Amino acid sequence: MSLEFGREVTGRLDVAESREWLVTNGIGGFASGTVASTLTRRYHGLLVAALEPPLGRTLLVAKLEESLECRGEPRALSTNRWADRSIAPLGYRDVERFRLEGTTPVWTFAWRDVAVEKRVFMEPGANTTYVCYRLLRATDPVTVELRALVNYRDYHGTTRGAGWQMQVTPVAEGVRIVAFDGARPFVLLGRLEGTPTPAASAGGPGGPGLLPTSSMPGPSVEVRPAHAWYYGFRLAREEERGLDAQDDHLHAGTFRATLAQGHELTVVLSSEPAVSTAGAEAWQRRERHEAGVLAAWRRTSTGGERPPDWVRQLVLAADQFVVRRPLPGEPEGLTIIAGYPWFGDWGRDTMIALPGLTLTTGRPGHARRILSTFARFMDRGMLPNRFPDAGQAPEYNSVDATLWYVEAIRAYHAATEDDGLLKELYPVLAEMIRWHRQGTRHGIAEDPADGLLQAGEPGVQLTWMDARVGERVVTPRTGKAVEVNALWYNALRVMAAFASRVGRESEQWAGLADRVRTGFGRFWNEATGHLMDVIDGPDGADDRLRPNQLFAVSLSESPLSAARQRKVVNACARHLLTSVGLRSLDPRHPGYRGRYAGGPSERDSAYHQGTVWGWLLGPFALAYHRVYGDRETARGFLRPLAQQLVAYGVGSLGEIFDGDAPHAPRGTIAQAWTVAETLRAWTVLAP
């Protein structure tokens, strides 16, 4: 499929703003914005640096205000929404084409006989963004002027700039900025590359659309330090979300260069102590990185089929979530960002996403490092659910993250037969189960009466349905949750297999699993023909139809008979299935909310009360195949997600959708477990 738009999208501001792009650097930093180049979220910017990888994410550079001048006539290429609700300038009207090359966004601006190409990409492993402008055609020289708008704030916040004096200092090729005493310095640098000949514009050794790395003399880029606040950017998406929707940014420097055909102007934005301004060489490094990602995937692709282009794109998207988490004694630790632009690394999300992001894409070494990294954080039999951005202690408020960890290790071992890691982690897993049986935080403990896991205490959300409004947990699910006990049964069966593999006693695990399977029968609701969502809660059983019961079918070990598995799949298909995921609640229930919109309390009240979750389509497709044996139909459930790669987060899959048709995309523009589970299910279902 073509990840490309013409003026039918780029020329309509509301449509161009509804499509967002994302580039990442592998350490938690990123750049993101809209196809229209407007700032509509507080998270939009050209350099959101992970100053304490993978977190500490700080907006350093918001945007470059772009303009051209040809034959003495200026033309603004930028577009901004302002607090007074005006829109100026209107540069989006000159965007002739937008496309992705790999994960790199590329714009073509066309004005009269002038055409300029712009691309934005990041240096792998560094808080460095390259913004490259290449003159494609013009009958006369064209002057490009770029005003750099900077900031220095937490990426969740907004800025009021009045009275804030930053230190802007000229340096070779640009300016150095110190926002306040103790702030991390960052630089804005400019360089002109290429040979001004018509032949050069066809491309060259620098890669498609880029030039050889010969550099023009430094003075050919004029750099002027500045210090002028631009007040009142209106963040339309934040306004829709009921949040502070006004932001200010500092104009800290202007870059000006005259381009002949074949020239390329590169502006480098970086918080690194040393950085190269050679844009063409940086682009080659970016290309090599993505080529390596695809090569690893191709080596492990199953069967003789040629995967569709949208699956190939998801492999590149998968790479964006896997980032470094350095630890004492383990500088190469890895983790998974749950979603861009606002999530950090979450234990549950990491373990659910790990097989699809690493094993399916042919990178088991990454999976091993992630599993080893998280083992370091095991405490009282629990993995952390969240690592706060501000560097506080991890939060241990998940009943299922550790159970998903067991399943992730199972998937890793099935793919690699790495007995070495299994022997290393087996004692950790055995200790985890001991804690779960005897009791750990938040009332998580085995019920000796039936062997099932129970969990919950007032004010604490423990399952993946974890929304809260103030102090109220929207879906508390206190008691024995169905997917938790499906995972518990799966973990015990897996531990029995692990024990045999490493030469330990397996009967104890098998005996516990048999007991749980018997107890799991209590979830069955004969009247409705599906499983209860929670039993033994404060108010008894909760018989609402939710997708959580699917995991009793889709996991490697199922506690259900074949007949009941089929009934579960049928119930979910009839009432929860959509073309983009599964609803989190049966629409027939009076608590159903079909639209995810409004302020934080309204949105959180709908988050798991009908909102569609894309990641659930993978488990559903696998469950369907398990009971019906029809690979082609099962894969057919996944195919509509291909259209989402051009509908919201371009080149990726987002988090959630409205429960009601037409199922508008909401939430994050790129969600790890949506990408991962789609990739994993597609691969497992290969003929």
Tell where the protein language model's regions lie, with residue ranges:
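Acidic, mature catalytic/reactive cores of soluble proteins
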Residues: 1-687
